[in-house]
Amino acid sequence: PEIWFGAVLFALGMYVVLDGFDFGIGMLYATRTDERERETFLAAFGPVWDANEVWVVAFGTMLLAAFPRVYSRLLADNYLLALGFVVALVFRGLGPELREQRDDERWKRYTDYAFISGSVFAPLLLGMLAGRWLFGGATLPVALTGVGLVAVSIVTGAAFLAAKTEPGLASELRAYGIGATLAYLGGVVVLLGTVVLTDAGGAADAVLSLPVTAVVALSVTVGLGGSVLARRGRYRAWLASALALPTLLTILVAMLLYPTIYPPTGLLVREAVVSPLALNLVTVLGFPVLLLVLWYFKFLYGVFSGPIKGEGYGG
């Protein structure tokens, strides 16, 4: 069961990391008024954003296959957040697609609104859904989790663009990324402090444990170190440290969940897993597919690893 618990959280982490910078690009898109810069932003993630959404499908599929009771409770208890997240993804996806259908300024403005709003609300609602998963109905921790995912998405989006665009634009994006980093780290500290003070979801003891404290300290170190790298213009290194932040966030979620898998009801991983026969069947069928998907993503990001030149990728 623990292997599948790790696989489910791995898929969630891959989605938060990869589609997270797409969301960040969408939010930073709102800061651009020059049409050429906007086209550059769209070109930055255009080849990969459809593929990145595979991971949210993988997360849902794995959760349903291995822990169907958790899947049903998570959606039943949070159906409005889940529905809002899906609607936000639709808006985020339709905006760039419809933008090119008509050469009309008003049309482009409306499609840009759809793209930007979807890019903001998708991580916000996904973060709130994760907060409800962890802390139940505690309002402030849930809201802070959503805002934290928005902030870290801006960090990864800014770092991704800075690593792939011209120096002049990269220096502007650096300011947004550093500001979002400080907001994210501050938000994490406030969130965990709130959990300790209110014992939201019964997670106070877990938050005060040594492993969780170590992950939080590492996140602060990585975030501040990334900001220093950004100020020095080492954008590739900044991107690596920025992508480490949502990775560490996912590890933190896993640590706060385990050994339960649905804290609001106290459901344990070993209690929620399907029967051994079904689990073995899912393992035999599922893990080769997961390895194939990982190989495909390695190939995809290798092809589009170069800088953006104009409205496309260079070599």
Where are these regions (language model features)?
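Hydrophobic alpha-helical transmembrane segments
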Residues: 144-150, 278-293
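Extramembrane terminal tails and long inter-domain/linker segments of multi-pass membrane proteins
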Residues: 28-29, 33-41, 45-46, 267-270, ...
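Membrane-interface helix-loop-helix junctions at boundaries between adjacent transmembrane segments
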Residues: 72-83, 91-149
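Transmembrane helix-loop-helix
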Residues: 72-98, 179-182, 186-244
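Membrane-interfacial helix termini and the short, flexible loops that connect transmembrane helices
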Residues: 29-38, 66-72, 93-112, 163-173, ...
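Short, membrane-exposed interhelical loops at transmembrane-helix boundaries
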Residues: 262-281
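Hydrophobic alpha-helical transmembrane segments in multi-pass integral membrane proteins
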Residues: 121-135, 186-198, 248-265
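N-terminal signal-anchor module of multipass membrane proteins
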Residues: 1-51, 57-60
